[in-house]
């Protein structure tokens, strides 16, 4: 709030506000019996309680007519003019309209700061050396006033004219008011003239609390914890203060690792709704090798989580090879990738085969089923596992039409049909060979040899020979 503190017994000349008045303009004998106080379009109470209204021209309005005429003041009947001796001079009261620097920052619609200059000089002085003196006070609009511009409070006492001003109460913290409204009043007052008989002893105005509370640089405002706008507790500083060495991700990076790939739901839905045999079509079901693959279950859709196998410990294989000494079909010089695990003599011709083999030692299973959350070390194992959930059986037997989910199962089943075929082909050729061996001279010997020398059905042949003999 722009409020100036009045000092005791400080005469101030009006030479800084207007031009010097001629000495012969107002003779002493023509002075009015009482001092004239001029407030255009104003309203004064007994003790100068209130002042409402401001002239729209924004200039200094001072009535200094020298003719003797009754005062035509639009004041209420409760106002009693202050009687003064004849030797008193005029009272010059002016009004200044100053536009604020920032019109939008003020709370008041008029945007005007009033500065009232009032004072009475006591004592008789010659007209030639008499100067119009006054004490300058500045009053700013009080936000607590009921009028449009506020209240200016003044009190007149003894002939010494001790102006006593009580500092106004601090204004409430309005949201629209800013610190730009409360400026130093010394910027609006003109410096004292060097030709005046008295000097201006100006003191800085008292400091009043600003509507904006001062922010301590060492304190940080507490903000409510909204989980939708702030990170998780593991990413927040537990002490609430952000230091210069704060990292963007204080949590361990293991929790931010990309999750392993899952089986697409579209793959599961397609084969579940289509039935167990939906994936089997025409020659693909009866042809050799693998049948049609699941859409999205190939190597393009299922990828392993990136990892470094050198950082994982290599453990020995729990189940060793069934035939460890069996030679490989590929020569050793064509298998340049040996297994680094201790006690494992496997060698591979391609690096991807070695990578897939190392997962056996490390136990890394980057492929996960989306239905049962089971992990697998190889993508083809995951593909065949998904078929247990969907019921897909793309591999059918060529002999009986039985369907299988895996090609090795169908291959194992096909061997059964091959063995049965071999037995059927060998069964019709046995009776002709037996008949040719039995035919010839000496039927009894042939019959004895049939019964006694039968290696396959010896007891059965002896029983039949006994029954045939009389």
Swiss-Prot record:
Its EC number is 2.3.2.-. It is found in: Nucleus. Residues 412-422 have a biased composition (Basic residues). Residues 126-141, 190-202, 426-439 have a biased composition (Low complexity). Disruption phenotype: Failure to promote expression of the Hoxb3 reporter in rhombomere r5 in the hindbrain. Changed morphology of the sciatic nerves, with a higher density of Schwann cells, and a reduction in major components of compacted myelin, including lipidic components, as well as myelin proteins Mpz and Mbp. Schwann cells in the sciatic nerves exhibit increased expression of Scip, reduced expression of Mpz, elevated mitotic activity and increased apoptosis at postnatal day P12. Total absence of myelin along the axons of sciatic nerves at postnatal day P15. Keywords: Acetylation, Activator, DNA-binding, Metal-binding, Nucleus, Repeat, Transcription, Transcription regulation, Transferase, Ubl conjugation, Ubl conjugation pathway, Zinc, Zinc-finger. PROSITE patterns: ZINC_FINGER_C2H2_1, ZINC_FINGER_C2H2_2. The keyword DNA-binding applies. Residues 126-153, 159-178, 185-210, 275-345, 408-470 are annotated as: Disordered. It is an enzyme of class 2 (transferase). The modification N6-acetyllysine is found at residue 247. Residues 275-291, 440-450 have a biased composition (Gly residues). Induction: Activated during G0/G1 transition in cultured cells. Pathway: Protein modification; protein sumoylation. The keyword Membrane does not apply. A zinc finger (C2H2-type) spans 337-361, 367-389, 395-417. Belongs to the EGR C2H2-type zinc-finger protein family. Interacts with HCFC1. Interacts with WWP2. Interacts with UBC9. Interacts with CITED1. Interacts (via phosphorylated form) with SFN. Sequence-specific DNA-binding transcription factor. Plays a role in hindbrain segmentation by regulating the expression of a subset of homeobox containing genes and in Schwann cell myelination by regulating the expression of genes involved in the formation and maintenance of myelin. Binds to two EGR2-consensus sites EGR2A (5'-CTGTAGGAG-3') and EGR2B (5'-ATGTAGGTG-3') in the HOXB3 enhancer and promotes HOXB3 transcriptional activation. Binds to specific DNA sites located in the promoter region of HOXA4, HOXB2 and ERBB2. This is E3 SUMO-protein ligase EGR2. It comes from Mus musculus. The gene is Egr2.
